[in-house]
Structures are given as C-alpha cells and as structure tokens.
Amino acid sequence: MAETQRRPRVYFDIQIGSQKAGRIALELVRLPFNDVVPKTAENFRALCTGEKGVGKQRKPLSYKGSIFHRVIKQFMIQGGDFTNFNGTGGESIYGEKFPDENFELKHDRPFLLSMANSGPGTNGSQFFITTVPTPHLDGKHVVFGEVINGKSIVRKIENMPTQADKPTTDVTIVDCGELSGEDYENATKQVADATGDPYEDYPDDHQGEELNAQVCFKIASELKNFGNTAFKSGDVALGLDKYQKGLRYLNEFPDPDENDPKDLEPQMKSLRFTLHSNSSLLANKLGQYKNAQNWATYALEVADAANAKEADRAKAYYRRAVAYSGQKEEDEALKDLQEALKLAPGDAGILNEIAKVKKAIKDSEAKEKAAARKFFS
C-alpha cells in the first residue's frame, strides 16, 4: 500500500518536569477510501510537523513546547494551547477556528483523540485524549484519531497530582512530528523500558495474550524482577513503580479458578506479600512514610496466607516501624520493632533501630518536661 493511502501517524515526545517520559504515537482518521474527518486530521497533523510556519497570533503553528494544561482522572487529558498554555488560546492552520466536520465517530473507548472546543464550530488547536469511554461528548466533539502506543504515558499523566485540574508539574510536548518509513511501521510495537519492562502500566490497557490468573502471575513476577533491577541500579522511584504495577496485575485476578494449577494460589499470595513488603522498603527510602506504613501492613495481613518466613515477617515489621518513626509515632514503632526482634533475635539492624527509637522517645519526654517547667516557672 502506498504511503499516501495510509492513515497518518504522528508522535509527541513527552517530558514531565525535567524527566523524559517517552513517546505517545497517534494514528489519525484520514483515508482516501474512508474520508471521515480529513480537515480535522490534517489540522492536527500539520500542527505536529509545524510545517505551516507562524499563525495569525504570531506564534509558531506547532504543538512543540506546549503543555497538557488540563487533566481529569477517569475522564481525559487536554493540551494544544500553544499560545496561552492555559486553555484560552491556540489556533488552527485554517485560522482561529473552523467548523465541526461531523460526529460520525463516537467516544466509545479510552485513548481516543478528539477536538476540544468552546461550543459548536469552535475547533482550533486544542485536543484531548480520553482515558475512559465518554459517550456524553458524542455529537459535541469531533473524534479524529487514537493512541496506538505510549498508553502508559497517557495513564501516567492522567494520574498526576493536579491543582484546579492543572498538573502540579508541567507535562510538556518537547518534540512532535509525523512518522514515516520504518518509524511508521514500528509505531505500534510495544517497546521495553530501561528495565526491560514491555507491559502497559494498567491491565485494562494490556494487549497480546488474554489475561488470566496464570498470565497475571507471570507478568507480576517479571515486574518484581524489574523492580529489583531498578532498585539495585539506584532508581528507587522506578523500582517502587514496578512493584506497584505488579500488584495491579495480581489484583486483576486475585484468585485462581478451579482449572489453574493447585500451587498457583500460594505462589500468588507469596508474591503479593513480597511486592507489598518491597514497596514499603522503597517508600521509606523516598520519605513516603504513610504509604510505607500501609504497604507493610498489607504485607503482614497476608503473611499467614502467604506462608511467609519468619525472617521476611521480621522485615515487614521493621519496615513498618521505620515508617512509624518517620511520622514521629515512636511508640508504635517500638511495638513493631519488638515484634520483629521476636522473629529475628539478635538482628543488629533491629537492635540499632530500637536504640534510636528509645532515644527519640527519651528526648521527646525531656523536651516535654522542660516545656512544663518553663510554663510553671
């Protein structure tokens, strides 16, 4: 098939804060033999390449350097305002606005590309990517493409902290353009990240073999190893991401069915314990003490079912104790350390932490007494 007969494919290279996040590849609905919304698709394609030069607002007609200015979880991520960066600007290659072509395509699934507008016939450059089906937008917004790769990046943006629906950290399109040749052909291929992880961040977005308990266990086991690799290389945040991703896949099928191997259930429970406990370890290192406390608690809750070894239970108690200490809850920390010591008698790390916690309690009591004396003097 000649290149001109194929649907255009374009890309966004995304940066979150100062960190590269990766590439989102999109396919546009514009075919000579299926001419659905050619004008809308051409507008987006040209704004990706920047080939139209400068617009009427004396700004480059290009998405390069613009941000995703509006993000609503379980709805969509929105960008394309390359003039004001806040949802009030942007313009099309045809002028400030152009009419709705048609509403033939529906918002019936996540990862669809659709035009943002401020009412009928007000299409400019702003667009959004759905993260769930949004049928209430049918007949109001023009769908003209879809994400074909980089869905994990869309999910990462969707789940970012926001203030008044704007990400608290800038999500920038640092480069964009049209794909051709080998890049076009490879646009749909899932590329492994630096750890070797080829899987989508969320099971709902998984493509390939059908998910079941055995497949999810296999993927979660691999993700544990990817997390270990990241942690050993010094990337604590990435390691934590992999452990949490593994739990998402395990939670997709929390219990095997009757046709699965008999040893699958205990293996799944053991893996769940490990992923929670490892998550607690890394969260402590990142100063996420409340999360670390919760994940250690989850590990201890499944310890019996997972048939966890005493040494591993001791680690979970120790990690929760560190989390309590980080939140200045020394009394709770001391209780957990004493439980850990019962399971791992004489452990130097536990004994050192007990000494630190007891000193913190003693120092706190001394401060309280000094404050009381000063108050009554």
From Swiss-Prot:
Give the main EC class.
Answer: isomerase
Q: Where are the TPR repeats?
A: 220-253, 273-306, 314-347
Q: Where, per UniProt, does this protein localize? A: Cytoplasm
Q: Which PROSITE patterns match?
A: CSA_PPIASE_1, CSA_PPIASE_2, TPR, TPR_REGION
Can you cite an annotated GO cellular component? cytoplasm
Kindly list the GO molecular function terms attached to this UniProt entry: cyclosporin A binding; peptidyl-prolyl cis-trans isomerase activity; ribosome binding; unfolded protein binding
**The protein's Enzyme Commission number:** 5.2.1.8
Q: Which CDD domains match?
A: cyclophilin_ABH_like
Q: Which Pfam families match?
A: Pro_isomerase, TPR_1
Which keywords does this Swiss-Prot/TrEMBL entry list? Cytoplasm, Isomerase, Repeat, Rotamase, TPR repeat
Function, as annotated, reads: PPIases accelerate the folding of proteins. It catalyzes the cis-trans isomerization of proline imidic peptide bonds in oligopeptides.
Name the family the entry cites: Belongs to the cyclophilin-type PPIase family. PPIase D subfamily.
Q: What is this protein called?
A: Peptidyl-prolyl cis-trans isomerase D
